[in-house]
From Swiss-Prot:
Catalyzes the deacetylation of 1D-myo-inositol 2-acetamido-2-deoxy-alpha-D-glucopyranoside (GlcNAc-Ins) in the mycothiol biosynthesis pathway. Pfam families: PIG-L (PF02585). This is 1D-myo-inositol 2-acetamido-2-deoxy-alpha-D-glucopyranoside deacetylase. Keywords: Hydrolase, Metal-binding, Zinc. Binds 1 zinc ion per subunit. The gene is mshB.
Length: 335
């Protein structure tokens, strides 16, 4: 996959994420970089992450098992994170704040909540697609970014975000609407970069090292493009992640109102570590991986004009990890 001088970088990029913090965890470098170079960058969040666990003792009563007020609290965290990433118009939510609820993990009772984003109601599914269609028609992004068919790590809300995104775009394309984007990208974590960063690292007190299967990783050979963050982008991602203090513990020495305990650990190659509530150590990498999930008018016999690759901070892979049919649909894709 190569860059083409005849096409410009996209002017409008929309990220579709399941919960507050996903925009920073999975795509923080790309959000920061696209904002930095002047692209109209928007983040659409589908739920408030009400079923999340909470780091630290102070705000434990916000969880769904207690007062169930965590979702509203996380709106504030998302607002701060977006500011760090250069997205200044504030949070946007599919259908409005709290229209759809965090479904929790698969096979849990929470997925049967009447507002669960990944619930099995056909009426809810249709409404979600229509709500995303309204956003696409209004904002007309050239590039959409979300997750792959497995949602990255199997969370039902991530899988639903993928399915709703692809279905909305399919309907726009089938109707011949100009609002159809040019391409959809799936955010993934490069396995080689992850393992290289974690080699020889000292695990912070109370945290643990990732075991096989703990972190969803994709081998570089299956990745189409890499976002190389500048020091500014990496710092923005780290600050955005730290803003989600109920969900993420960043080992940069910072103490917060949410979590007064500090950790200060970097990898031998200089990356800060972070952990979710499971306390599995992970590096904040200066690179993000992206798979090309769909491209408009794909032709498998020619090099395609791929908008995202015209950003200077995006490095294409040596080959194309996904093969696309003439209808632009990834072979093997069901969503």
């Amino acid at each position: 996959m190569t860059k083409h001088a005849t096409h410009a970088a996209p002017q409008r990029v929309l990220f579709v994420h399941a919960h507050p913090d996903d925009e920073s965890l999975f795509t923080g470098l790309l959000v920061s970089a696209s904002s930095r170079v002047g692209a109209e960058t928007s983040v659409l969040t589908c739920t408030l992450g009400e079923e999340g666990e909470v780091i630290g003792e102070k705000y434990q009563n916000l969880t769904s098992e207690h007062s169930d007020l965590l979702g509203g609290f996380r709106i504030g965290e998302l607002q701060q994170a977006l500011e760090h990433l250069g997205v200044h118009q504030g949070p946007q939510f599919l259908g409005g704040p709290s229209r759809w609820r965090d479904s929790g993990m698969a096979d849990t009772p929470t997925i049967r909540h009447p507002r669960a984003f990944a619930g099995d109601s056909e009426d809810n599914w249709e409404l979600q697609v229509e709500q995303l269609l309204a956003v696409l028609r209004r904002e007309r992004p050239e590039v959409l970014v979300t997750y792959g068919p497995d949602g990255g790590y199997g969370h039902p809300d991530h899988i639903r975000a993928h399915r709703v995104t692809h279905e909305a775009v399919r309907r726009l394309v089938d109707a011949g609407e100009e609002a159809a984007p040019h391409e959809i990208w799936w955010a993934v974590t490069p396995a080689g970069a992850f393992h290289a960063a974690m080699t020889g690292v000292e695990i912070p007190e109370g945290w643990r090292e990732a075991e096989d299967g703990d972190v969803a990783l994709v081998a570089e050979e299956f990745i189409d493009a890499f976002v190389q963050g500048t020091p500014e982008d990496v710092a923005a991602k780290r600050k955005a992640m730290a803003a989600h203090a109920t969900q993420l513990w960043v080992a940069d020495g910072t103490r917060t109102d949410v979590n007064p305990e500090a950790r200060d650990t970097t990898t031998p190659t200089g990356e800060y570590l972070f952990a979710l509530s499971n306390l599995i150590s992970q590096p904040i990498l200066p690179v993000e991986g992206y798979q090309l999930g769909w491209v408009k008018n794909a032709d498998p016999n020619t090099n395609r004009q791929i908008s995202l690759l015209h950003f200077d901070f995006v490095v294409p892979s040596n080959g194309t990890a996904q093969e696309h049919g003439n209808d632009g649909k990834v072979r093997g894709e069901n969503g």
